[in-house]
């Protein structure tokens, strides 16, 4: 059975919802899934004052455990067109894994959230994939296999590179049913492709 990690960073809970949906989809695809998050870097008093969702259930991951999985889906908030510093800080600690080639031929995939439709989602998806490529990981994107990302009638999440959600910073827009469906699709797709590669 494929072992998958869904690893995320979420300040306000939007990516937490997407990560849970991706984990559901991966389980539907036959994977054994672990859901974890990266540590928060913002001081607790600042996080509370900014209304961060600090009561998230998922345990904190450690960089060394990434080698224990066949596939890793990263979900991160976007900051100025890049992954959040919390995720970058975590990935910057994987140099030891890189030196050993511990993630070579593992499967990787990415999802992101932004506060606006044009908040740099695609750039954040691609730049996070670069981190995985430096490790020799095999990238599995959302791709246009997920057709529900097409259309301009409503705000829709998704890009060929990975699933996205646009969630307003004030909480007035949460991930939509379509965006959560896309996250489940991506999780299932990654699980099924990983099974073909590592099964």
UniProtKB/Swiss-Prot annotation:
Quote the PROSITE patterns the UniProt record gives: FLAVODOXIN_LIKE
- Coiled-coil regions in this chain? none
Per UniProt, the enzyme's principal EC class comes to oxidoreductase
Query: Looking at the record, which segments are called Disordered?
Result: 158-181
Q: Which GO terms describe its molecular function?
A: flavin adenine dinucleotide binding; FMN binding; NAD binding; NADH:ubiquinone reductase (non-electrogenic) activity; NADP binding; NADPH dehydrogenase (quinone) activity
List the InterPro entries hit by this protein, alphabetically: Flavodoxin/NO_synth (IPR008254), Flavoprotein-like_sf (IPR029039), Flavoprotein_WrbA-like (IPR010089), FMN_Rdtase-like_dom (IPR005025), NQO (IPR037513)
| Record-annotated Flavodoxin-like domain positions | 4-190
Task: Give the binding site residues for NAD(+).
Answer: 12
Copy out the cofactor comment.
Answer: Binds 1 FMN per monomer.
Q: Where is the composition biased (Polar residues)?
A: 163-177
Q: Which GO terms describe its cellular component?
A: membrane
Binding sites annotated in the UniProt record for substrate? 98
Per the record, the similarity remark reads: Belongs to the WrbA family.
For this entry, the protein name equals NAD(P)H dehydrogenase (quinone)
């Amino acid at each position: 059975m494929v072992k998958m990690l869904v690893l995320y960073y979420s300040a306000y809970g939007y990516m937490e919802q997407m990560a849970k949906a991706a984990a559901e989809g991966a389980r539907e695809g036959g994977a054994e899934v672990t859901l974890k998050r990266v540590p928060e870097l913002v001081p607790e008093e600042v996080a509370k004052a900014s209304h961060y969702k600090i009561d998230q259930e998922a345990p904190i991951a450690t960089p060394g455990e990434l080698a224990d999985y066949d596939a890793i889906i990263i979900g991160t908030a976007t900051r100025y067109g890049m992954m959040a510093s919390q995720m970058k800080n975590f990935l910057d600690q994987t140099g030891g894994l890189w030196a050993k080639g511990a993630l070579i031929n593992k499967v990787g995939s990415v999802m992101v959230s932004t506060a606006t439709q044009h908040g740099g989602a695609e750039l954040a998806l691609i730049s996070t994939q670069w981190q995985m490529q430096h490790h020799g990981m095999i990238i599995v994107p959302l791709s246009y296999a997920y057709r529900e990302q097409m259309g301009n009638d409503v705000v829709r999440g998704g890009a060929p590179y990975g699933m996205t959600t646009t969630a307003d910073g004030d909480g007035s827009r949460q991930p939509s049913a379509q965006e959560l469906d896309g996250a489940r699709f991506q999780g299932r797709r990654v699980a099924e492709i990983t099974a073909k590669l590592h099964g």
